[in-house]
Structure formats: C-alpha cells, structure tokens
Regions:
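Small/polar/charged residue-enriched interaction surfaces, especially the RNA/DNA-contacting tracks
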Residues: 1-567
Length: 567
C-alpha cells in the first residue's frame, strides 16, 4: 500500500450571518453600571490581526454532521461507523485493553480566511468586521435583562468563503498497522467521505460557528461553475511528489455528492405584514462623542445645525449588513425571544391555575439567566436552557422591499406639571416595509432527545413518552403562534408605543411526519367562517387527541399540558 494525498476545495457563500468566537475579552466589572460598555465577542485572529474561522471549529461541525447522517441512514449510504473512525481518528473510547497509541485523524481542515475588503480597523484590531447587538428580556418585568447585553462580530450573508480539506490515505510501503490498532483509511474511504461532506453542504445540513438557533452560520455552495474541486497524488515517487507540489495539486478526481435529502426538521412558514411598522433599532456606535449624540440611538436630540434647533437624530432600523443598501432585518433572535417569553407566560399561567407546587407565584427577584434555567419543561425543550441546546431555530426575516419611510416624533410628558418634558423629544425612522415570511425550524431529533432527557429515559427505551412530550411541546408553540395570528403578540421594539403589530395572512407547517403531525396550509380568508387562530387551535386539538397523559402528573391533568409537570 502506498500513500495517497487528497485536497478538496469547496467554494461557499454565507447564507446567514456567521460568527465564531475567539478569545473573549475580559469585562471590567469594577466600573459602575452607568459607565459599563459592551465587550464584543470577536472572531479568532491570526498573527496579523485578520479575522478567521478556525479549522478546529469547521472540523467539529463537519464531523458532527457526518455522525448525525450515519445515525439517521446507517451504513447503507456514505461511510460506515468503522470508516468514520478510520477517517476522523480515535475518540478515546477504545478502552484500556489496547496498547496501541491513539490514531490521529486522516483529515486536516484548514483555517478559513474571511473576506475583509472594505473593512477598517481600530486601536485594538487591524481589521474589524461589523457587529450586531442584542439583549435578553426579563420574563417577569418585560424590560431589558441585567447583565444580558451581547455584541457579536459577524460576517454578513452573501460573502464567499473557500474551505480546504486535505487527507492522507494508506501507509508507506513496508509499514504495517500495529496489532489491535485501527487501520488508516484507503483512497475509497476518503473519496466516500468527501462525497458525503459535499452532499451535506449542498443540502444545507452544515452550519458553522455559534448562534445557530438564531439562524446564524448557514452556508451554501457557491454559484460558480465549479463549486468544488478534488485532486490527488501519490508522493511516494518523484513524479508523484512533483505532481503534488505543482500548482494544480495533483490529478483531478470526479466526485458525486451524496444525496442527503430529508432534513429531519419541521418547517413553519408565516406569511405576514405589519400595519404599524416593525422597528429593531440599530444601536449607536461606541465612540468618544458624548453630550448631544449620547442618546441618538433612542431618537433623543442629536447634533443640530443651530444650537436652539429641536431636531432629533432618529433611531434607524437594523439592517442585514453594514451598508445602507442592505435589506432591513427582523433578527431571528428577536422573534425567538418574543416567542419564548409568550410560551413561558402560557406555561406558567397553566401551572399556577393548577396550583402546581413547583411553580412559585412570585419570581420577580430571579435574574434573566436564572429565569431561563427555571422555565417550564416544554419551554426548555423548545428553546433550550443554560444546560442544553433548544430544538427551535428562528431565521432572520428580511424585508423584500424597504418601502417609503416616515419619521415618527413623540415626546415625554412632565409627570409633575403635565406639560412637555424639556429635552425629551424622541423620533424613529420607520419604513412601511414588505416582509419575507417568518421561518421557524424544529429539529425533531433534538426535540426528542431533550424530551427523553427531561423524562429521565435512556435512548432506545420501549414505551417511551418522549414522542408524546415532543408533540406536547409543539402544542405549546402552536398556542404561541395562535396568539401571533390573533395580533396579540407584537414583534420588535416600541410595542407599548403602538408599533410591532403583526397581521398573519397564512401559515404553512411541513415536515412533521416524524411526530405524526400532518402538513398544514392555513390561510386567513376575508369573510371566512373560521379565523386563522381558530384554524390553528383546531389543528392543535387534533394533535392533542393523540397525546397520552403523562403518568407523573397528578389528578386533573390531561393531554399536552400534563407534560408541564414533573421535570
């Protein structure tokens, strides 16, 4: 057997914002609350200060995607379990009986350089990518949560990336595999893995970096003529070594991607509009400017041409990128937070009405992170907790057209005199945008895993209640969506000022057969006998009828709500 070296280059384009954290900067907590500023979570950087996506991060995402595909399809398609072990290396689970050393991976995933054209640096970093800020909402008070303000450096959607993976198959002539050790992969196994990786990327099964539940990190194959190239060479001979070191990197190899269809995800698409306008404001950049510009992000008085001018600098909507030409965006994290807050409210209302002893009537003193950990069980299954990841992903919603803009001005009243308060004139720049659909995805495998873990059931247990609990979680989410369709759940900011109203026109649910849920195609027809919220509730009753009662719940609990108890 001789050594064969491969090099795979895949040309990608970001289909959503991409963030992968490097070394976190230390927050100076000695400063007072009013003097504190956010510390951005930035990409890892090379020695020249350029942001990059580390090969370790990409390799972990690819390995997890391959492992999940094998669990779903077995060894009939793509590499087998043994072949994956040969390719990715040992994971340290062979036990103490083997005297052979752990085998390193045959796959090397190289660092992905991020495109930085047009971006400038600051005092700390040579190149700085755009950042997006967000904050968690206190579930009890409805205000911004303390110690829950986040700022992430990100690469905008639509940027091209080049992913390079090299591999080595076989052993040099005369070298034998130690007894009991895992043999290195052969050329056939390497090419089979590369076909699977290309197929996973092509079918949208791979996401890089963090904030994936907010829809970040998704990539797609480039539209270029040759989205991927695979070359190989045998460097054991002089001719093979020259071939490998040439500009071409060896002989070209044809590889057909594996068909990885069937995402294992339930998809909910909501067609909607907003009669009042949606605003998630772009925060003001940190800088040395104080005084007049200090509150510009909130629409407070800004710089004026004349000292006595009453003009304000309006709060402007957040866009999908740093350019003015980028579309207005309703972040997936914002929608997801609104859905979670309402789901928590519904679940806690039911638990209090049933006088569940594990639910306290007063939880006003809990911090926002503690609130997430104490959320009812079905909420944690869907949205995650401080311990495990949730099953629900909400993608960024882009405006298909900005539409005309208008400046909305308002002022605060003096609570003592009843007149206009001095220096408290605010304004927002609101666009009458036409929006794309809100898209929610539920990872059914993750939901079932969370449900079984919450019930304390091991994987593969017969007579599992995990599927019933998963359907119960869908029922809870369905109630939240019914409230959204009824117009009682505003999105974005300024909801108490009349903004953020949502008018749902249609809702489609697909891919729920794994939970025994049929596809839905519901529309809000004018003059119809049943409104869209009632149609949603009707579908939820059908789902609830197939849910067996949780045996851990006490008397008086039935159907989906019984799974709010006992975990």
């Amino acid at each position: 057997m001789s050594v064969t070296r491969y090099e795979l280059t895949v040309h990608l384009v970001t289909d959503a914002p991409l963030h992968s954290g490097g070394i976190d900067e230390v927050v100076d907590r000695r400063r007072g609350p009013e003097d504190r500023t956010t510390v951005a979570r930035r990409f890892a950087r090379d020695g020249h200060g350029r942001p990059l996506l580390t090969g370790r991060s990409v390799k972990g995402a690819l390995r997890a995607a391959c492992q999940r595909f094998r669990e779903e399809h077995g060894g009939a398609v793509g590499p087998t379990e043994r072949e994956l072990r040969q390719l990715w290396g040992d994971d340290g689970t062979r036990g103490a009986g083997s005297a052979a050393p752990l085998r390193a991976s045959a796959i090397t995933v190289h660092t992905v350089e991020l495109p930085t054209e047009g971006y400038e640096g600051n005092e700390e970093h040579k190149i700085v990518l755009p950042t997006r800020m967000g904050n968690a909402i206190d579930r009890y008070w409805g205000s911004a949560g303390d110690t829950a303000l986040f700022k992430h450096e990100y690469l905008p959607r639509g940027k091209e990336l080049a992913l390079t993976i090299t591999a080595e198959a076989g052993l040099p002539d005369g070298v034998e595999v130690p007894q009991g050790d895992v043999a290195p992969p052969g050329p056939e196994q390497v090419e089979k893995l590369f076909a699977l990786i290309i197929g996973l990327v092509k079918d949208g099964k791979v996401a890089f970096g963090g904030r994936q539940n907010a829809g970040w990190g998704r990539v797609a194959l480039s539209d270029s003529e040759k989205a991927w190239t695979l070359t190989k060479a045998e460097p054991g001979s002089r001719a093979g070594l020259e071939e490998w070191l040439s500009g071409a990197g060896g002989r070209s190899v044809d590889v057909a991607p594996v068909d990885c269809g069937g995402s294992g995800r339930m998809r909910i698409e909501i067609t909607w509009d907003s009669p009042t306008g949606i605003l998630v404001a772009e925060p003001q950049d940190d800088g040395s400017e104080e005084g007049a510009d200090a509150g510009a992000a909130d629409g407070s008085p800004g710089e004026a041409e004349e000292a006595d001018s009453e003009e304000t600098k309006p709060a402007r909507p957040l866009r999908a990128g740093p350019e003015e030409s980028d579309p207005i965006v309703l972040p997936g994290s914002s929608v997801r937070g609104a859905l979670r807050t309402r789901a928590t409210r519904i679940a806690r209302t039911i638990l209090l009405a049933k006088k569940d002893p594990s639910t306290g009537a007063d939880w006003s003193g809990a911090g926002v992170h503690e609130q997430l950990a104490q959320d009812p069980s079905l909420v944690r299954d869907l949205f995650g907790s401080t311990i495990h990841r949730g099953a629900l992903t909400v993608l960024d919603t882009l405006a298909s057209e900005d539409g005309p803009s208008r400046k909305v001005t308002h002022n605060a009243g003096d609570r003592w005199t009843g007149g206009v308060a001095d220096g408290l004139l605010y304004s927002e720049e609101v666009y009458d945008s036409t929006w794309n659909s809100i898209v929610l995805e539920i990872d059914l495998d993750r939901l079932l895993t969370n449900a079984r873990a919450g019930l304390g059931e091991p994987d593969g247990q017969e007579d599992s209640r995990g599927e019933d609990r998963s359907r119960a979680a869908f029922c809870l989410l369905g109630l939240v969506l019914a409230e959204l369709a009824a117009g009682t759940l505003p999105l974005g900011s300024r909801g108490t000022r009349g903004m953020g109203q949502v008018e749902v026109k249609a809702m489609a649910v697909t891919g729920g057969k794994g939970l025994g849920i049929e596809n839905w195609a519901l529309k809000a027809e004018d003059g119809a006998d049943e409104s869209l919220p009632r149609l949603i509730l009707k579908g939820l009753r059908d789902v609830n009828s197939g849910i067996e009662r949780n045996p851990r719940a006490g008397a008086g609990w039935e159907g989906w709500s019984s799974y709010l108890v006992g975990s």
